[in-house]
Amino acid sequence: MFWLLIAILIVQRAAEMAVARQNEQKVKKQGAIEFGESHYPYIITMHILFFLSLIAEVLLMNKQPSSWWLGIAAVILSVQIVRYWALCSLGAYWNTKILVVPGVELVKKGPYKWMKHPNYAVVILEILLIPLLYQAYVTMCLFSIFNAVLLSVRIRAEDKALQEYSVK
């Protein structure tokens, strides 16, 4: 079951990166400006290391699924629904990079009606829940900290870019 989860997550991330590349091309044709280029490689690296850490911790420490695995899995699936709701709400404006088309209105539909950064909330929950599924507490704690640091930089950069270039 562990390898199936890893495979699903890797396929999901690869598909998202493909969509992000397509969306990047679309919005750059509309004049999108990229922000946060300096921290972007760290975000990619953190996500790769998250999976490697999870795999290493589960295998090397012989971690087994939590006795709460069914409930945790249900929450993870619910979080995925929110992820795709957020992505679909942004449409071509969704990206893994910070790309802002000057003069375009901020999206205020879907989960963006209630929350400024729902996809980041999803990532926070995933970094907590996925390791929790296999009791990989070291990965959960370390990468929650790494993610918090990176998101603090990322959200500031994104908010500044959106404030300067988007129509409110």
Curated annotation (Swiss-Prot):
The lineage of its organism: Bacteria, Bacillati, Bacillota, Bacilli, Bacillales. It comes from Bacillus subtilis (strain 168). Keywords: Cell membrane, Membrane, Transmembrane, Transmembrane helix. GO terms for molecular function: protein C-terminal S-isoprenylcysteine carboxyl O-methyltransferase activity. It is a multi-pass membrane protein. InterPro entries: ICMT_MeTrfase (IPR007269), Metal_cation-efflux_comp (IPR052527). It is found in: Cell membrane. It holds the Pfam family ICMT. The chain crosses the membrane at residues 1-21, 41-61, 68-88, 123-143. Its main location: membrane. GO terms for cellular component: plasma membrane. It comes from the Bacteria. The keyword Transcription does not apply. This is Uncharacterized protein YpbQ.
